[in-house]
Amino acid sequence: MASITMMSSFLGGSTVAPAKVPSANRRGVVMVKAMHEGENNVVISKNEESKNSGRRELFFAMAAAAACSVAKTAMADEEPKRGTPEAKKKYSSVCVTNPTARICRY
């Protein structure tokens, strides 16, 4: 399970939870209805299935994302030759701010 927490730091979406104030440490009352024994067993088995497949689903999603990024790179069009009108059109923002850039001149 430690690998999943490490994975979140690589994805960049992790945030730090704010520290709790000690004075605001109040607990509310929770009302729980009694359940039949058969329903309780079904819920537990569903939780066990989701625990086992959660990590597998994470790695399948990561593999799919990696495959998509590789395919996108492979399908990228070729760079235009430097100094050509196509290069100046593609990199117009660079050529306007820095006209001496290598892509804008021969």
Swiss-Prot record:
Post-translational modification (record): Disulfide bond.
Tissue expression as described in the entry: Expressed in midvein, lamina and periphery of leaves (at protein level).
Entry keyword Nucleotide-binding: no
GO biological process, one term: photosynthesis
Disulphides: C95-C104
Span of the signal peptide: none
Compartments in which it is found: Plastid, Chloroplast thylakoid membrane
A cellular component term, taken from the record's GO annotations: chloroplast thylakoid membrane
InterPro entries associated with the record: PSBT
Superkingdom, natural source: Eukaryota
Keywords annotated in UniProt: Chloroplast, Disulfide bond, Membrane, Photosynthesis, Photosystem II, Plastid, Thylakoid, Transit peptide
Presequence positions on this chain: 1-76
The keyword Transit peptide belongs to this UniProt entry's keyword annotation: yes
Its job: May be a component of the oxygen-evolving complex.
PANTHER family per record: OS02G0581100 PROTEIN (PTHR34940:SF4), PHOTOSYSTEM II 5 KDA PROTEIN, CHLOROPLASTIC (PTHR34940)
Protein name: Photosystem II 5 kDa protein, chloroplastic
UniProt lineage: Eukaryota, Viridiplantae, Streptophyta, Embryophyta, Tracheophyta
